[in-house]
C-alpha cells in the first residue's frame, strides 16, 4: 500500500492501524480555484491519489488533503511567522471548520469521502498568539496550527473527529481501507 502524502502526522496515524505501507509524495499542486471547502478537500485528495496511482497501478493508494475554513475564507498553510500570527488571530474566539478529504484507489476502483469537524478556539491575547507563532509549529499545517502539539492549548472545543483535525480522519480511513480489502489492525 502507498500513502500519497509526505505528512508525518498521516504517516504516524496510518502506522498505528497496523497497515504496512510506503510513502510516495504526489507533488500535486494544492492551489485550485474551487472555493467550497468540502469539495476542495475531496478533489485534492483524489488528484493526489490518481497522480501516485499512475506510477503504481497495482498498489492500493490512499491520499488525503485538509482544508480549514473560517466562514467563506480558506486558510491554507501560512507562508511565514507573520501570516501564522494573522491566521491564529482570525481564529481566536471563533469556530471554524476542518475538512479532510480521503481517497483510496485499488484495482481501478476509487472510493472516497470528506470528514468535517468544528473547532472553537478560546479567546487569545496577542502575546499568546505571538508565542505560538514563534514556535513554528503551525507553518506546515492548514489553518496555521497543530492540534496534536502545543496548538491544543488554543482550542476550547472540538465537535467531531479529533483525528480529522490532525489531518487523517481514522473512522473514514478505516471504512475506506476495509472497503478496498485492506486488513486493518491485523484482521
UniProtKB/Swiss-Prot annotation:
Q: Which GO terms describe its molecular function?
A: dTTP diphosphatase activity; UTP diphosphatase activity
InterPro entries tied to this protein: ITPase-like_fam, Maf-like
* Reactions that this protein is recorded to catalyse: dTTP + H2O = dTMP + diphosphate + H(+); UTP + H2O = UMP + diphosphate + H(+)
Chain segments annotated as transmembrane:
none
Q: Which domain of life is it from?
A: Bacteria
CDD domains documented for this protein: Maf
Which class of enzymes does this protein belong to?
hydrolase
Which chain positions carry the site (Important for substrate specificity)?
9, 66, 148
- The EC designation for this entry is 3.6.1.9
Q: What is its main location?
A: cytoplasm
Q: What does this protein do?
A: Nucleoside triphosphate pyrophosphatase that hydrolyzes dTTP and UTP. May have a dual role in cell division arrest and in preventing the incorporation of modified nucleotides into cellular nucleic acids.
Q: Which NCBIfam families match?
A: maf, PRK14361.1
This chain's protein is named dTTP/UTP pyrophosphatase
List the source organism.
Answer: Deinococcus geothermalis (strain DSM 11300 / CIP 105573 / AG-3a)
Amino acid at each position: 500500500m502507498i500513502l500519497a502524502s509526505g505528512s508525518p502526522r498521516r504517516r504516524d496515524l496510518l502506522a498505528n492501524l497496523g497497515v504496512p505501507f510506503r510513502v510516495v509524495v504526489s507533488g500535486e499542486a494544492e492551489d485550485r480555484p474551487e472555493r467550497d471547502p468540502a469539495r476542495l478537500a475531496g478533489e485534492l485528495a483524489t488528484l493526489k491519489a490518481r497522480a501516485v496511482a499512475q506510477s503504481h497501478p497495482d498498489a492500493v493508494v490512499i491520499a488525503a488533503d485538509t482544508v480549514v475554513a473560517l466562514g467563506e475564507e480558506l486558510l491554507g498553510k501560512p507562508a511565514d511567522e507573520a501570516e501564522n500570527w494573522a491566521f491564529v488571530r482570525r481564529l481566536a474566539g471563533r469556530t471554524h471548520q476542518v475538512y479532510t478529504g480521503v481517497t483510496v484507489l485499488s484495482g481501478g476502483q476509487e472510493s472516497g469521502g470528506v470528514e468535517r469537524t468544528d473547532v472553537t478556539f478560546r479567546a487569545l491575547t496577542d502575546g499568546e498568539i505571538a508565542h505560538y507563532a514563534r514556535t513554528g509549529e503551525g507553518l506546515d499545517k492548514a489553518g496555521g496550527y497543530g492540534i496534536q502539539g502545543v496548538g491544543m492549548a488554543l482550542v476550547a472545543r472540538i465537535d467531531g473527529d479529533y483525528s480529522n483535525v490532525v489531518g487523517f480522519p481514522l473512522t473514514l480511513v478505516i471504512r475506506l481501507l476495509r472497503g478496498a480489502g485492506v486488513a486493518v489492525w491485523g484482521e
